[in-house]
């Protein structure tokens, strides 16, 4: 199995699905000749031509609405928002139409599109290039919001997203694009959308996270084990919405102690939904208040201050210790 | 460096074939077969009678807020140009076109009566459901057009919107995408002069809305939107061009909203009676009827018979609708079609409501 990074893994998913199914088309700003600003779509235009790898005018609502029309005709468009911070232009199309056309038409029409967007901090970028607003999408009935955390699961989830009959928001943690390599099999691999995963088993505390925050979470879990003999169970949501609460509420019943980690601002963030479900389904098993280690309720600062904003291993460790000592 | 002029020619044609008295400009006659002329007349009359009936139903509280189409019936001339394999992308004032393309009157009553079923377009009819956010559906017609072209299908997507929609960003993005990708899209702007209370003159500083086509380097034309022959002829030109690979067209139908925006507003507050009276003289049905009588395609008895006939059709549709709603609806099916497959968290919510409802029954 070749070791590849997340950019290559996403590229692999796109090229293999395009190879298999001529209804799959890729579109967005600079995705063709340039191969995307992060090179995610590198080389696709040479293999599949400009009719299938479409450099569009610079208009995010246009890209989304145009994709909806294609999807209504039976294509499977995978559109790219260059940065999630510019995707709000597209939100109206996704909320008002992509998410509703199946419902509005009683199942006659569907919008099997994927909206990909790099999200999150950690790449020393300008304003509007570092935020984490998955909660906007997750709050929209009719959409699915998927966030991978490694090259291998990014590839498998994107294949599933492309094949999914409903619109999928695919947020890519850009801090992880080239952060590490992983064995990704060349043969087909999928992961179910709407299912979380236990990525590390443990009995003392449950850590729940997804996307870019999985790295500091796993780092904290290793340190807890190595230095303190504390075994954390780590759960990767993979799909933020519709949320799979079976694994994490089960884990909470086992450990009684939970810390939730994400980059998104705390208030009304995905962590709020996770805590609500823990209260609904595991309340009597909880030994300590559930802690949230998250971004703050402010705009993510420019990069000289973003380390302090982002939930790093130290903040996670502190929250775990306080939860265990409660 | 000198200042240099880039010469752009902007000439917006205005096409009218039947004047207000029903007199035909012979040179421009689109030579529509007699049976199609009569079908168009009947469709316009049916739309008018159905619209009137819905206003009564709304006032009686039997349906909710609805958007009348009175005065804009000549739009069927555009829908009549489409083939069954083409796509109609409507906004919310295209009832006459939707009916022409096979949507049922019951379906319209379902929507305004508050039933989701109104959007359930039967298989085989390529109409999208009504789109309410102004201008947003224009992009869908461009994506449809791109996909038609990609698949090598010689089809066309026709999208309707109003004068107010030309102020929306999505309209401009759609025009731009359509022109860049030369999609087989026909942009059908029904300039009815009023976006709720804001007049056309405050909507855009442009002399015409059709001239906005120039910025995207596509053909743009103004049609007398109350003259069904002009609407047919202009739409046919645009649809033929799109079908043969000639790309998109912007058409401005100059018409008038003779009634209110929706039953929730009172036009007396923002426009004069005199203006409405002026436009009543240009009523698309009256004009067309005069022409057809002049050609002896319609007689007094024929008009009376057809009117009786469409009134019956409206009554029968209403009766069918009443019978269907009389059976009641299952509130639990509100959860259906949110996703192709219901996620477990949503299933749990459906079960929650199911329990509540069964407890209430007990």
Model-derived features with residue positions:
Chain B
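Short, histidine-centered active-site or binding-site loop motifs used for metal coordination
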Residues: 21, 92-94, 189-192
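Glycine-rich ThDP/TPP pyrophosphate-binding loop and its adjacent helix/strand module
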Residues: 135-323
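Short, well-ordered beta-to-alpha junction loops that form the rim of enzyme active sites
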Residues: 92-93, 253-255, 326-328
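Conserved acidic/glycine
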Residues: 1-75, 259, 268, 273-362
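A residue-level signal for beta-strand positions that form part of recognition/binding surfaces
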Residues: 14, 85, 248
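Structural signal for conserved beta-strand scaffold positions within catalytic alpha/beta enzyme cores
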Residues: 19, 90, 222-224
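Cofactor-binding active-site loop characterized by glycine-rich and histidine/acidic residues
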Residues: 49-52, 56-183, 199-205, 210, ...
């Amino acid at each position: 199995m070749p070791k590849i990074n997340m950019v290559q893994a996403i590229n692999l998913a796109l090229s293999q699905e395009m190879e298999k199914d001529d209804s799959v088309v890729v579109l967005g700003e600079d995705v063709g000749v340039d191969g995307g600003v992060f090179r995610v779509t590198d080389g696709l235009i040479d293999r599949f031509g400009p009719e299938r790898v479409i450099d569009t005018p610079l208009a995010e609502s246009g890209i989304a609405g145009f994709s909806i029309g294609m999807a209504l005709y039976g294509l499977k468009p995978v559109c790219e928002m260059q940065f999630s911070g510019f995707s709000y232009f597209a939100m109206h199309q996704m909320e008002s139409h992509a998410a509703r056309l199946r419902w509005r038409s009683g199942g006659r029409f569907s919008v099997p599109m994927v909206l990909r967007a790099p999200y999150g901090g950690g790449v020393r970028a300008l304003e509007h290039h570092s935020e984490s607003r998955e909660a906007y999408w997750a709050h929209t009935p009719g959409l699915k919001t998927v966030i991978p955390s490694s090259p291998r699961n990014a590839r498998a989830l994107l294949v599933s997203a492309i094949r999914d009959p409903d619109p999928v928001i695919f947020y890519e943690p850009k801090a992880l694009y080239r952060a590490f390599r992983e064995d990704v099999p060349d043969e087909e691999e999928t992961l179910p959308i709407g299912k979380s995963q236990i990525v590390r088993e443990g009995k003392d505390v449950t850590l729940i996270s997804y996307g870019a925050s999985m790295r500091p979470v796993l780092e904290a879990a290793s340190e807890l084990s190595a230095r303190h003999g504390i075994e954390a169970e780590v759960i990767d949501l993979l799909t933020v919405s519709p949320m799979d609460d079976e694994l994490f509420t089960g884990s909470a019943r086992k450990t009684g102690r939970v810390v939730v980690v994400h980059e998104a601002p705390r208030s009304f963030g995905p962590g709020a939904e996770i805590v609500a479900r823990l209260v609904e389904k595991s309340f009597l098993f909880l030994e300590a208040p559930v802690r949230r280690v998250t971004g703050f309720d402010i705009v993510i600062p420019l990069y000289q201050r973003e380390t302090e904003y982002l939930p790093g291993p130290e903040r996670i460790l502190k929250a775990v210790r306080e939860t265990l000592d409660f | 460096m000198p200042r240099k002029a880039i010469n752009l020619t902007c000439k917006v044609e205005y096409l009218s074939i039947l004047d207000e008295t029903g007199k035909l400009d012979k040179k421009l006659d689109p030579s529509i077969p007699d049976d199609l002329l009569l079908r168009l007349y009947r469709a316009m009359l049916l739309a008018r009678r159905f619209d009137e009936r819905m206003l009564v139903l709304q006032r009686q509280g039997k349906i909710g807020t609805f958007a009348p189409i009175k005065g804009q019936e000549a739009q069927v001339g555009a829908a009549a140009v489409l083939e069954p394999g083409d796509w109609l992308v409507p906004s919310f004032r295209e009832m006459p076109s939707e009916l022409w393309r096979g949507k049922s009157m019951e379906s319209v009553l379902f929507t305004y009566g508050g039933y989701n079923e109104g959007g359930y377009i039967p298989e085989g009819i390529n109409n999208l459901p009504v789109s309410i956010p102004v201008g947003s559906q224009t992009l869908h017609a461009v994506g449809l057009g791109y996909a038609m072209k990609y698949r090598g299908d010689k089809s066309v997507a026709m999208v309707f919107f109003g004068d107010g929609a030309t102020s929306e960003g999505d309209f401009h993005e759609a025009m731009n995408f359509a022109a860049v990708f030369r999609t087989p899209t026909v942009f059908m702007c029904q300039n009815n002069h009023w976006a709720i209370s804001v007049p056309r003159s405050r909507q855009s500083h442009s002399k015409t809305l059709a001239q906005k086509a120039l910025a995207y380097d596509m053909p743009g034309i103004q049609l007398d939107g109350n003259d069904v022959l002009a609407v047919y002829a202009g739409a046919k030109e645009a649809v033929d061009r799109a079908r043969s690979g000639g790309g998109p067209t912007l058409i401005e139908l100059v018409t008038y909203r003779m009634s209110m925006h929706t039953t929730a507003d009172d036009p007396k507050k923002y426009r004069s009676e005199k203006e409405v009276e002026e436009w009543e003289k240009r009523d698309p049905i009256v004009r067309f009827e005069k022409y057809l009588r002049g050609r002896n395609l319609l007689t007094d008895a024929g008009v009376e018979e057809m009117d009786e006939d469409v009134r019956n059709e409206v009554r029968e549709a209403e009766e069918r609708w009443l019978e269907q709603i009389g059976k009641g609806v299952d509130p639990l099916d509100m959860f259906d079609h949110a996703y192709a497959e219901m996620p477990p968290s949503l299933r749990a919510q459906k079960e929650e409501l199911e329990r509540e409802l069964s407890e209430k029954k007990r």
